[in-house]
Every structure is written in structure tokens, then in C-alpha cells.
Amino acid sequence: LESDFADMDVIGISGNFCSDKKPAAVNWIEGRGKSVVCEAIIKEEVVKKVLKTDVALLVELNMLKNLAGSAVAGALGGFNAHAGNIVSAIFIATGQDPAQNVESSHCITMMEAVNDGKDLHISVTLPSIEVGTVGGGTQLASQSACLNLLGVMGACKESPGSYSRLLATIVAGSVLAGELSLMSAIAAGQLVKSHMKYNRSSKDVSKAAS
């Protein structure tokens, strides 16, 4: 930089426009790392029998909670139910930088009824997933084993960068599944019931089972 701009004084190597580890509108505008959109159509039968709810209720809940509710809260990147839970779990398991969960969890979840209102179309848009498959924590034994399990360990010599791109799509797909699961549980009134039923804090876990 100094060779190109002789009169410039370098105060610091970063001016924070990079927005590393910070929520920022620029991540939505320009993207950062990998920008991924993942979508799926869930058949009416699956919504009713497996998810125990219905399409219209899910669409309404998503609009009121993830969109309107997040807007009222002044959310910058959090127009979703719990993308951060999924992203941080995968990041820790695969040796990513956990602090980059901040911008990598930027996500907007959309739901709409399709096919004459019978089926559910769900999509998640994550504009700034920051992942890698070489260096850093990816070299740790457990983390490299997880990457190997996913088929994205190390560098791809035939197509440089393809493993990190694939890992980003895995993250997005997992986020979509997590969004569908939690939103269905809330719509069906099962979230609180399951927490109360399986809440381990109600048991003395310090005592070994006899």
C-alpha cells in the first residue's frame, strides 16, 4: 500500500470495514466468506405426520416470529429461529473459528405455501459463512476426523476451494433442518413440553445411576 500511496500513513492494518467477528450490514450487501442459499419443499404429508403441524401455521409463525419479531427487536442478521446454534456446533466440531459464528450465523429464514397451499417451501439465506478445511483447528485430531467424515478434509488438489464451498453448503443445509425442526416444535406446542420432560436439571446428575 505504501508503495502505491506514498503519502499515506499506515495507522493500522485493519480499519474494521472487514467487520470480522462483528454483525454488520456490509455482510448482507457484499457477502463475506461463502454466501449460500439452501431451500427445500416439504410435502404436506410430512408436515402433518412427522412435524406434527400444518403448512399455514408454519408460514404464519415464521412471518410473525422470524421476520416481524426480529424487525421489532432491531435485528441486523438474525431473521431466523436459531441458526447460531447450528453454526456454532458445526464450527466447533470441524475446527473453525468459533468467534466467526457472529457473522456466519447471519441468516434469514423464509417459508411459504406452494402447490395450492398444500406443501411448504422453506429457504435459508446465509450471506457470510466463513469456513476452511486447512490450517488452524482443522488439524486437530477430533476436528479433522469430523471433516473426513463429511468428505471435506484438507485441500482439494483437483478443484482448489471446493471443499470449503461444500462445507459451507453443509452448514446451510444443517441450518435449514434446524430451522424446520424448531419452528415445527413451536408451532405444535411441543417445545416447552419437551424441555420440561427431558430437563436434566430436575434430576440429581451428580449421583451415578444404580
From Swiss-Prot:
Enzyme Commission code(s) on record: 1.1.1.34
* Pfam families cross-referenced by the UniProt entry: HMG-CoA_red
Q: Report the active site residues.
A: 21 (charge relay system), 97 (charge relay system), 195 (proton donor)
- Keyword Cell membrane recorded: no
The answer to whether UniProt assigns keyword Transmembrane to this entry is yes
* Biological process terms in GO annotation: coenzyme A metabolic process; isoprenoid biosynthetic process; sterol biosynthetic process
Its pathway is:
Metabolic intermediate biosynthesis; (R)-mevalonate biosynthesis; (R)-mevalonate from acetyl-CoA: step 3/3
State the function annotated in the UniProt record.
Answer: Catalyzes the synthesis of mevalonate. The specific precursor of all isoprenoid compounds present in plants.
The name this protein goes by in its record: 3-hydroxy-3-methylglutaryl-coenzyme A reductase 2
**Top-down, what is the taxonomic lineage of the species of origin?**
Eukaryota, Viridiplantae, Streptophyta, Embryophyta, Tracheophyta
Gene designation: HMGR2
